[in-house]
Amino acid sequence: MSTLLLVLDLIGTFVFALSGATAAVKRRLDVFGVLVLSFVVGNVGGITRDLIIGAVPPAAISDWRYLGVSILAGMITFWWPAIIKRLWSPVLVFDGAGLALFAVSGTQKALAYGLNPVMAALLGMLSGIGGGMARDVLLTEIPAVLRTDLYAVAALAGAAVVVIGNVLHFPSVAVTIAGAILCFALRLMAIRWGWRLPTARQPDQSTRE
């Protein structure tokens, strides 16, 4: 399980870092800004998770591989942006992949540290949405989790699959893959078809008068 968590964490860090770097390039940040954003976006969710469950120091600052994959993602995006631009909505695709991977890896790590299933699922969701929130805040945007298509709900759904599979003693690898696929699919379908949670209805001008 430790190997699976490490692989998921590193892949999730890489794709989230790609989303941060891509957003930075679109905003025409310099190379330092791109690398900073790629590291922060790629690692803030995992750092938050590790601090909450007491896994200190967090893996992102104690294992050089996290810094390495973050810098690699930033440099690829900075020097070869044309490769990234060929993808459909690259920021959204990378963000969805990072969301899915961190949601399931965060849930698995929370379970491994003894959290109950409900709290493990919530922490998995928090791990997933952390990177996207950091990216949007640093770029002075309202975080996607607060304003757009299904985001946190997709992460929670993927985390729930992992938790249910763990309770039913299904193979960890299978439920982790299933949870990640569900989360990623929900996120992309929400983007494609505009699925979103209800928003508060604003009173009409005539009603206020």
What is the predicted role of each segment?
Residues F32-V40, D63-L67, W88-L99, A121-L123, ...:
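Cytoplasmic-side transmembrane-helix entry/capping segments in multi-pass membrane proteins
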